[in-house]
């Protein structure tokens, strides 16, 4: 794909889908917290994006902010692309923000729509949600709040077959894709405004390296860094470019057993990952005795040398 010709992140997904038609029945997204058989194919993801987009378009004007508060899961990517396809701007929130941060962000961005994963996340921000803001949930937990599942079911019954062959082609590279707020450790969180073109440029830079490293036609990612972080948020579009299979880890604590299940061929990492890995290895090392322990010590010594 010639990225310089792509105008938006939405176009990126749909053009990749068209480019590799055989993808449609390939496994694309899988959350390791759910049943082993629960996965989404490229076709299902595309279908859900289109259905959710139709609903969001009825409630959004171009540039309206949409808060997305959720742990990493397949619905995160679906909601993100659906928001942008409907002309909105995604405002991803960390699930670990302080109450003060949540209050500030909601006042600052004035979201038109708030997509929340479950009751736990909803309770964190409930009192900061304006009466003018429409709340949508990923999981069913409140009869007064419409869920994505209900929305998809309703729209699937409508005569909307035409939308599945097209996307919003009015989005330009200069248009705002998302606003990612800093953690607020040095005062109030600062909203970083990222355009479609800016993120696409980062993807282009990443591909210059990854295309040389990823020899496999179907690379496997294990995503564990928060998608609300600008780094991992960009990576999800690199995953699309590579036509990868994506597993979402349960948590940092379960990262190693999740790696054994997903068998990733590529992962994004930060110092915290290596620290966690080193700690686990050190704990196992301390339990070893005799010749096995001496062999490990020799290996470490040679590695350092």
Give, region by region, the residue ranges found by the protein language model.
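Structural core segment of the AMP-binding/adenylate-forming
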Residues: 58, 85-154
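Conserved AMP-binding A3 loop
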Residues: 39-43, 177-203
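Conserved pre-ATP/AMP-binding loop-to-beta segment of ANL
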Residues: 158-181, 188, 214-220
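A short helix-loop-beta submotif of the ANL/AMP-binding
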Residues: 65, 71-91, 95-99, 107-113, ...
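A short N-terminal helical cap/helix-turn-helix that marks the beginning
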Residues: 2-28, 47
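ANL superfamily adenylate-forming
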Residues: 122-173, 282-305
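Conserved AMP-binding/adenylate-forming core of the ANL superfamily
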Residues: 28-73, 77, 81, 98-103, ...
